[in-house]
Regions:
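Helicase P-loop NTPase motor core
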Residues: 1-4, 10-26, 32, 40, ...
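A short acidic, amphipathic alpha-helical/loop segment
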Residues: 21, 50, 211-217, 356-360
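Extended, H/D-rich, highly charged conserved domains that either
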Residues: 206-279
Length: 400
């Protein structure tokens, strides 16, 4: 039972080192389970990378999972997966029903609860409270700190009423996605999949209290836990001065895990440090390597060599900004032999740029995947269905 960190700058090869290490060890020890935990959205890409890297192009004793998928696997293995899992729509329906029953007990939310989207916001607050292991009773301290006569305190009291009613309604019937990790902690000692396995975590910048609780149980039951951490060699990863310093999230993650390891009496092994200069990702782009090294450092240093890695364009409006980006992408594809999958467009406000990007890229015949949530009510099909229902209801009313 041990904990090991892999430190390195962005682009230094932390994931590469971790994946290669896991592949080598999995081939040496085919009887040991190796589990790589990544954020939910990266599971498929990580599986693909491992299969391509593996000499045999197969990962029989390596599983790539997120925290939620790991919980499902363990609950299924231990026979604790019989309770139905409630999704977000189910939560909204239950909360709307409970809001009607508790309407007389609500002081602040009473006048807003029927507004479109308000129940969804209440659901999000309750979900976050669950993720951070705060019970309805635990909200008493929050209310006291907020000054019991303040507007915030009254709103928190209403949330507490809804939260308490929600918990009572779910008892022994359903479990939420946020509660799965708490249940996982209670059954982890029964899992043969996790016993003496090697856990590797990649792509995280921090953990919720429930995830930290899961990691504590892993340190107790698993052979080893490895985790990649973005860190600069000029920083001490084990010293957290304040939450506004550079790499504060990484330091908070490291210090909390070291504390958990100490509580579980688990050895913290010597870390792997990947601090070579320039970092691997920018080995052929010295200007970007300099930018990575000096950004937010306020050292006063400037890059004086000629470079073409960083370009700044000024445009009169978002439409012209997007058109400039489209022209540059077309140039890279036609002249520099780039591939579309190698190009990303990052926008500060998708509500402002999304329509312009879709329209302009369609004109330039550039395929694009928009990574943002669309409002279904504003889609063409959504508007069509709503107006169709409205016309039908008007006809029914006129006939009756």
């Amino acid at each position: 039972m041990a904990l090991q960190f892999i430190f390195g700058n962005p682009g230094s090869g932390k994931s590469h080192y971790l994946y290669e290490h896991i592949i080598r060890e999995s081939m040496k020890h085919p009887d040991i389970n190796y589990i790589i935990l990544v954020p939910e959205q990266f599971t498929m890409q990580t599986q693909k990378e491992l299969v391509l890297r593996h000499p045999r192009h197969g990962i029989m004793n390596i599983d790539v999972l997120s925290f939620a998928r790991l919980a499902f696997r363990v609950l299924e293995e231990t026979g604790n997966g019989s309770r139905e899992i409630l999704d977000d729509e189910g939560k909204n329906l239950i909360l709307r029903r409970l809001a009607g029953k508790k309407e007389d007990s609500l002081k602040v939310l009473k006048g807003n609860i029927k507004k479109p989207g308000y129940i969804s916001e209440v659901k999000s607050v309750i979900s976050e409270l669950t993720q951070y292991n705060i019970s309805p009773d635990g909200m008493d301290d929050m209310i006291t700190e907020a000054d019991e006569s303040s507007y915030l305190a009254w709103k928190l009291k209403d949330i507490q009423v809804m939260y308490q009613a929600f918990e009572e309604y779910l008892a022994d019937k359903y479990i939420t996605k946020e509660e799965i990790l708490d249940i996982l902690c209670n059954v982890m000692d029964k899992s043969r999949m996790l016993k003496d396995s090697v856990i590797a975590l990649d792509g995280f910048t921090g953990f919720t209290p429930l995830q930290n609780k899961v990691l504590g149980e892993m340190l107790h039951h698993c052979q080893k836990v490895m985790i990649t951490v973005t860190m600069d060699k000029r920083e001490d990863p084990y010293v957290m001065k304040d939450k506004y310093q550079l790499f504060a999230l990484s330091k908070q993650m490291v210090t909390s895990l070291v504390k958990i390891a100490g509580e579980e009496k688990v050895l913290v092994e010597e870390p792997v440090c990947l601090y070579q200069e320039p970092v691997w990702r920018f080995r052929n782009a010295p200007a970007l390597a300099f930018l990575e090294k000096e950004l937010f450092r306020y050292s006063g240093r400037t890059y004086r060599e000629k470079q073409s890695n960083v370009r700044v364009y000024a445009a009169a409006n978002p439409r012209m900004e997007v058109e400039c980006a489209a022209q540059r992408i077309r140039f890279l594809i036609r002249k520099k032999e780039y591939r579309y999958r190698e190009i990303a467009v990052i926008a500060s406000d998708m509500n402002l740029y999304a329509d312009e990007i879709e329209k302009t890229f369609r004109e330039y015949e550039i395929p694009v995947f928009m990574d943002y949530k669309r409002n279904v009510l504003l889609s063409i099909s959504g508007v069509f269905l709503r107006w169709q229902n409205r016309i039908f209801l008007q006809k029914v009313c006129s006939v009756s």
